[in-house]
Structures are given as C-alpha cells and as structure tokens.
A protein has these predicted regions:
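Catalytic core of DAGKc-family lipid kinases
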Residues: 30, 39, 77-194
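Short, well-ordered alpha-helix to beta-strand connector turns
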Residues: 31, 56, 188-189, 260-262, ...
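Short Gly/Thr/Asp-enriched flexible loops that form oxyanion-binding sites at enzyme active sites
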Residues: 67-79
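Gly/Ser/Thr-rich active-site loops/lids in small-molecule metabolic enzymes
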Residues: 150-158, 202, 208-231
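A generic structural signal for short beta-strands and their flanking turns/coil linkers
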Residues: 171-173, 188-190, 212-217, 262-264
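ATP/nucleoside-binding phosphotransfer catalytic cores, i.e., glycine-rich phosphate-binding loops
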Residues: 179-181, 210, 220-301
Length: 301
C-alpha cells in the first residue's frame, strides 16, 4: 500500500517539519511506500490532494482546519478517494475534536496506525465542499480575518480580539432557507451556521452532532425580537451566549432557531460573504447538499 503525507511546514510553529523523520518512520511501519510532500503556497494542499488521489491508498496530512478543508476540496470531487488521516497542528482544530485526534504527534500517529475508519459526511455549498461549517454574519470572518502572526503569538485569543469589532458593529442580513421537505425559515439574522460538527471556533456548542448521520444542523440567531430595535451589541451577546450554552439550550435561547435537514436552498438579499471551514468563501445565495458517507477518515477508537 502507498501513503502520501502532505504537511504545511509553517503550521504549528514548524513542529511537523522538525518531526517529519519520526512521522516517516512510523508510517513505514504500516505502508510499503511513503511519500512526503511539503506545501509551498496557499491552496497547494488542495492541488496536491487532487493530484495524488489516483496513486495512493492513504492520504495523511497535517495543518489546521484550513488545510483540512483544502484536502477535502481536493478529493471530494474525485471518483477514487483515499482514506484520510489527520495530524492537527493549527490554532483551533475543530476537525480534530470531531475525530478524536490529538495535537500530540505520537498520539495522533498511534491512532492513524490503529486505522479505525469512519465514513464521514461532507457538505457542498454551491460548488465548494466543506467538512464542518459554513457560516454567515457576525464573528464568521474571525478565522480568516485574523493575521497569521497574531495566531502564532496569541493563539485562540487572537480570534477573540479580532471579533470585538463585530460585537459592536456587526451587520444583520435577511435570509430565506427552504429545506428539501419544503419547510421555509425566513428571518433577519445576526448569524447563521450550517454545521456538520460538534465544535466550531473551539466551542463545543453542538455536542450531540454526528458527522456520519446524513443530516446537517442549521442554526439561526435572530437579530430582532418582537418590539425590539435591532442592535449589534445585543445580537453579538446572543451569539456568544449560544456558543457558551450550546444550541440545545432552547429555554434560555429563545432567539436561536435550530433545525436539521439533508439539504436546503439559501436565498440572500445581499451579497453576504460566506465563511467555509474557517476560510473566506463566495457571496450570495447558495444551494447546500449533503454527501452522505462520502470520505473515509481515520478516527480515535
């Protein structure tokens, strides 16, 4: 069997680059052939993943949630898709929480070599694939708007500081969501998230999520309640409370609407920017599809 290992040499303060010989030796315990490839520029992991699909049985990679998305983007449209394994070295690592992977390289390598596989769902928004979240509105731009040097220096705190502006100046948007069964939700929102994840932004606010059940979680935070003027600060606090309490705490979160579906059409009046797996995406109205059990991924036993 052949394994390709793709790694971002700059992720995790260069930790993977220092440990690549160790990773190679561990992979050789299982695979007859191991090829190590370092990414050299943005979206390179996507290009590499797409290229190696036909030639490898396993695709192991390291990086943050952005790298995870690039790998998914690269393999999801291919007819032959290798089993993927992940060593998290990013700042937040939401995908790692879903899979039970560790930032400790030895522990992650142990899990990868145990080779317990899960048929993971993948979502498609327009022509973009994503593994765990697509979002609109306040705080959704934090991950891609935060400078890389600040992430390295401050970690998760860098995201929090970058999001303070949204707390006071977040913009609301009108959205109409039509589910595959015909149900319609039409609201003025401060935030909307489309989730296939237990964790987003480091917050485990969707603990009951199953990344292989064929269903997508939708959560909308209304920006205006009855007899209330829309205020970005109030809306921001509502979003923050939702992340802290979880989307199931409906008694305390009357402004939060949560529902599930296997797909939807999302209509936006304005060209609001999408955040896809923590990266800047397209703008405007989109169709979302669920690709059930689309990718085999290694998970913790």
């Amino acid at each position: 069997m052949k394994c390709v290992f793709i790694y971002n040499p700059n992720s995790g303060k260069g930790k993977i680059k220092k440990k690549k010989d160790y990773i190679y030796s561990r992979l050789k315990e299982k695979f007859d052939e191991v090829e190590m490839i370092a990414t050299e520029y943005p979206k390179h992991a996507l290009e590499l993943a797409e290229k190696v699909c036909e030639e490898c049985d396993y695709l192991i990679f390291s990086g943050g949630d952005g790298t995870f998305n690039e790998i998914i983007q690269g393999i999801a449209s291919q007819e032959k898709r290798p089993v993927i394994g992940y060593i998290p070295t990013g700042t937040v690592n939401d995908n790692a929480r879903n899979l039970g992977m560790s930032k400790n390289i030895k522990k992650s390598m142990d899990i990868i070599l145990q080779d317990k596989q899960l048929n993971m769902d993948i979502c498609k928004l327009g022509d973009q694939y994503f593994s765990y979240v697509a979002a609109l509105g306040s705080f959704s731009a934090m991950s891609y708007a935060t400078k890389q040097k600040n992430k390295k220096l401050l970690g998760v705190l860098a995201y929090a500081l970058n999001g303070m502006d949204d707390l006071f100046h977040g913009k609301n948007f009108d959205v109409k969501v039509t589910l595959t069964d015909g149900t319609v939700y039409e609201k003025n929102c401060a935030f909307m998230g489309i989730l296939n994840s237990k964790s987003v932004g480091g917050f485990r606010f969707n603990k009951e999520a199953d990344i292989a059940d064929g269903l997508i979680d939708f959560v909308m935070v209304e920006s205006k309640m009855k007899n209330e003027k829309p205020r970005s600060f109030v809306s921001g606090l509502r979003i923050f409370k939702m992340f802290l309490r979880g989307i199931k705490a409906k008694r305390d979160l009357k402004h939060v609407i949560h529902f599930v579906s296997d797909g939807a059409t999302i209509e936006l009046k304005d060209n609001v920017v999408w955040c896809i797996d923590g990266e800047k995406g397209d703008t405007g109205s989109k169709k979302i599809e669920m690709l059930h059990h689309h990718v085999k991924v290694i998970v913790k036993e």
